[in-house]
């Protein structure tokens, strides 16, 4: 009689694997927990080659961690997803997911089946989103530009630029409004990637500036070229204008030494003809990602055109999109002939080389197809400038979301406290097993105001109790429903009306983080078996099919 089927690996099942997963998730959440909120602390991460990153952006911290545990990887990917989808709320989504898992694990230990917990969580998430949309949203039309500035300031409050929040919030709002365009369906769009952020260390934060136009960190190819061109016609080339050399391996047999000179002459004429074709269309600004030989620069100087070499491909794409140009990787058409047409050119009102701060930059102003904006950041050192860039990215995304969806919710733990009270009452109305799961979901949400208070060195138990009392009153007593805007004031350590204080977050940040955290918790909760296969051993003679063939083990 044969023995049972053996699995070549380590297998853990049931409660052991669930506890393991919950512990892994909790340890990831504990890493980012202290960086949460307006008084959160920063993390210093050093990679294997010694590069240092100082940040308190949840997505960046988790991206730089090398995590082995599969359940912990789910949370790292969750933060990355929140960053890509919304741009802000990356730390809170991880903290909520870990807390949901911890409380679900407690229920499972009390012999409640994971399926009941999962269906309870799904129901609670659905109800929470409905409650936010019906009761907690504030329409931005009634608040105007102030609402955008306050949302940006709320996003920046936990970051390195929070101290100059007013200055940067106005800059961010102006930048997002500058890149606005209307798509084919008539919807306004705000492509945040069109805001070019350049960093130059030196000076203070407050000397950072917003520039109307797209800034390139390049200079003109030759001193003899004009530094300013009005009514620019821009050619975007993704190849170098250097002397054409024959490919490696090409052999030419020559009988007459004069032919060698002709070959060399032809090599230089090919590039000369390309340049003449480009200039013949009226192009007066040529941007290329490659190099331009000095001997060819004279043709541009003679034509009075501005040629810029070594432009970053990312920048070239943005310039092409903004000016309406086509990026060409070759001049050859389908027939193999080299042509360049006027339709391939982009247009801008002005291209100028200016000295801004301590650097020479090329500014492309008032492009034809779309408007663009650039922000130049100043800071004490590279670490600071990098962190400022991450902070601005979050703020830009927040302003974009507020403009697109035209609604915000109060910050400072107000939404979580309101949902916690509502879901607790909702749970008692449920007559099924889901009641316990919904109650745990409600309790899990309090981790947000709790963590905010702990990080601000306040008495979290006292503050959260007061906050819950206000929200309970708002939901029980219709006359006092304005208390639903009450959130935490972490500087003075007391509850306050966050609608009046101007602490706003985009609705989508809260809704998405709830949905993503619930889905991530459910994904990990469903796992009840973990099989880790052993790596194939090197000294196993018959480990692979090839080895078996060579050793003759397969011969009859």
Swiss-Prot record:
Top-level EC class as recorded in UniProt: hydrolase
GO annotation, cellular component aspect? acrosomal vesicle; cell body; centrosome; chaperonin-containing T-complex; Golgi apparatus; heterochromatin; microtubule; microtubule organizing center
Q: Which Pfam families match?
A: Cpn60_TCP1
Q: Which residues carry this modification: N-acetylmethionine?
A: 1
UniProtKB keywords: Acetylation, ATP-binding, Chaperone, Cytoplasm, Cytoskeleton, Hydrolase, Magnesium, Metal-binding, Nucleotide-binding, Phosphoprotein
Q: Which residues carry this modification: N6-acetyllysine?
A: 199, 400, 494
> For this protein, what is any one GO molecular function term?
ATP-dependent protein folding chaperone
Reaction catalysis annotation: ATP + H2O = ADP + phosphate + H(+)
Judging by the UniProt lineage, the source's domain of life is Eukaryota
Q: What is its EC number?
A: 3.6.1.-
The UniProt function text for this chain reads: Component of the chaperonin-containing T-complex (TRiC), a molecular chaperone complex that assists the folding of actin, tubulin and other proteins upon ATP hydrolysis. The TRiC complex mediates the folding of WRAP53/TCAB1, thereby regulating telomere maintenance. As part of the TRiC complex may play a role in the assembly of BBSome, a complex involved in ciliogenesis regulating transports vesicles to the cilia.
Q: Which NCBIfam families match?
A: chap_CCT_alpha, thermosome_alpha, thermosome_beta
Q: Which PANTHER family match?
A: CHAPERONIN
Binding partners and assembly: Component of the chaperonin-containing T-complex (TRiC), a hexadecamer composed of two identical back-to-back stacked rings enclosing a protein folding chamber. Each ring is made up of eight different subunits: TCP1/CCT1, CCT2, CCT3, CCT4, CCT5, CCT6A/CCT6, CCT7, CCT8. Interacts with PACRG. Interacts with GBA1. Interacts with DLEC1.
Q: What is this protein called?
A: T-complex protein 1 subunit alpha
What is the primary gene name for this protein? Tcp1
């Amino acid at each position: 009689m044969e023995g049972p089927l053996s699995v070549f690996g380590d297998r853990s099942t049931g409660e052991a694997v669930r506890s393991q997963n919950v512990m892994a998730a909790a340890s990831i959440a504990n890493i980012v927990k202290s960086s949460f909120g307006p008084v959160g602390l920063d993390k210093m991460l050093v990679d294997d080659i010694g590069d240092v990153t100082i940040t308190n952006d949840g997505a960046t911290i988790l991206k730089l961690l090398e995590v082995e545990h599969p359940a912990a990887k789910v949370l790292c990917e969750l933060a990355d997803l929140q960053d890509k989808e919304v741009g802000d709320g990356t730390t809170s989504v991880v903290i909520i997911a870990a807390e949901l898992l911890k409380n679900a694990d407690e229920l499972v230990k009390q012999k409640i089946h994971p399926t009941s917990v999962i269906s309870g969580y799904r129901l609670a998430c659905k109800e929470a989103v409905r409650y936010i949309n019906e009761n907690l949203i504030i329409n931005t039309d009634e608040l105007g530009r102030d609402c955008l500035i306050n949302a940006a300031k709320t996003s920046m409050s936990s970051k390195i630029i929070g101290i100059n929040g007013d200055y940067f919030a106005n800059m961010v709002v102006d930048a997002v409004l500058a890149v606005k365009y209307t798509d084919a369906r008539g919807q306004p769009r705000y492509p945040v990637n069109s805001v070019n952020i350049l960093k130059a260390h030196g000076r203070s934060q407050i000397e950072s500036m917003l520039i109307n136009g797209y800034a390139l960190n390049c200079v003109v190819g030759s001193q003899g070229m004009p530094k300013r061109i009005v009514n620019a016609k821009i050619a975007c080339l993704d190849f170098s204008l250097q002397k054409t050399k024959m490919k490696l391996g090409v052999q030419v047999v020559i009988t007459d030494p004069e032919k060698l000179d002709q070959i060399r002459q032809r090599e230089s004429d090919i590039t000369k003809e390309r340049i003449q074709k480009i200039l013949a269309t009226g192009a007066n600004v040529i941007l290329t990602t490659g190099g331009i030989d000095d001997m060819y620069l004279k043709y541009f100087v003679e034509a009075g055109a501005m040629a810029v070499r070594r432009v970053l491909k990312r920048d070239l794409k943005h310039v092409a999109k903004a000016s309406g140009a086509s990026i060409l990787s070759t001049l050859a058409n389908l027939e193999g002939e080299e042509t360049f047409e006027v339709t391939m050119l982009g247009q801008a009102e002005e291209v100028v080389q200016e000295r801004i701060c301590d650097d020479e930059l090329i500014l492309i102003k008032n492009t034809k197809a779309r408007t663009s904006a650039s922000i130049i950041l100043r800071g004490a050192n590279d670490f600071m400038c990098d962190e400022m860039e991450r902070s601005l990215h979050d703020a830009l995304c927040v302003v974009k979301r507020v403009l697109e969806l035209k609604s915000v919710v109060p910050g400072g733990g107000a939404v979580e406290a309101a949902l916690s009270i509502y879901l607790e009452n909702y749970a008692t109305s449920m007559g099924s097993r889901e009641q316990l799961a919904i109650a745990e979901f409600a309790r899990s949400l309090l981790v947000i105001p709790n963590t905010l208070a702990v990080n601000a060195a306040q008495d979290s138990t006292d503050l959260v109790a007061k906050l819950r009392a206000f929200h309970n009153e708002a939901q029980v007593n219709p006359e006092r429903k304005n208390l639903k805007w009450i959130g935490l004031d972490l500087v003075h350590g007391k509850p306050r009306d966050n609608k009046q204080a101007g602490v706003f977050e985009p609705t989508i940040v809260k809704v998405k983080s709830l949905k993503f955290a619930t889905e991530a918790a459910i994904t990990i909760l469903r796992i009840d078996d973990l099989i880790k296969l052993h790596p194939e051993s090197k000294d196993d003679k018959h480990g692979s099919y090839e080895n078996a063939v060579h050793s003759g083990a397969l011969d009859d």
